[in-house]
């Protein structure tokens, strides 16, 4: 039984080590906002786990937050804005030679 538990613990350690999810050391913050405090107050300070959050960075996200359903919506809105600008630019653009030629040929056929 003891041997089984040891094997299980060893496998669990290897699993977490391979995945890179092993526990990291804890960083102790002596005072809040970097202000100087007495020793008793610094003991009351909370401990902070400093862990790199690389899994939270995705393309198209802001400030390392996960990209949710709103990312697709914003992309669609951006596409619509670009299309609208292109249509407006076509209307405001002065006719070029190819534009005039196409309309001339279409009128004569």
Swiss-Prot record:
Propeptide: 36-53, 67-109
Entry annotated with the keyword Secreted: yes
Tyrosine amide: residues bearing it: 33, 63
GO term, biological process aspect, one: neuropeptide signaling pathway
Keywords tagged on the record: Amidation, Cleavage on pair of basic residues, Neuropeptide, Secreted, Signal
Disulfides per UniProt: none
GO CC terms: extracellular region; extracellular space
Coiled-coil region: none
MF (Gene Ontology): receptor ligand activity
The UniProt record lists the keyword DNA damage: no
Location in or out of the cell: Secreted
Cleaved signal peptide residues: 1-22
Domain of life according to the entry: Eukaryota
Function comment: Neuropeptides RYamide-1 and RYamide-2 are ligands for the G-protein coupled receptor RYa-R. May suppress feeding behavior.
The protein, known as: RYamide neuropeptides
Species the sequence originates in: Drosophila melanogaster
């Amino acid at each position: 039984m003891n041997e089984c538990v040891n094997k299980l613990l060893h496998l669990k350690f290897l699993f977490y080590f391979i995945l890179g999810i092993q526990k990291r050391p804890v960083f102790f913050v002596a005072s809040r906002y970097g202000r100087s405090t007495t020793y008793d107050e610094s003991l009351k300070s909370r401990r902070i786990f400093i862990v790199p959050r690389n899994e939270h960075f995705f393309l198209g996200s802001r400030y390392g937050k996960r990209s949710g359903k709103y990312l697709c919506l914003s992309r669609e809105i951006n596409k619509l804005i670009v299309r609208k600008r292109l249509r407006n630019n076509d209307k405001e653009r002065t006719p070029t030679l190819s534009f005039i030629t196409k309309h001339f040929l279409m009128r004569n056929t």
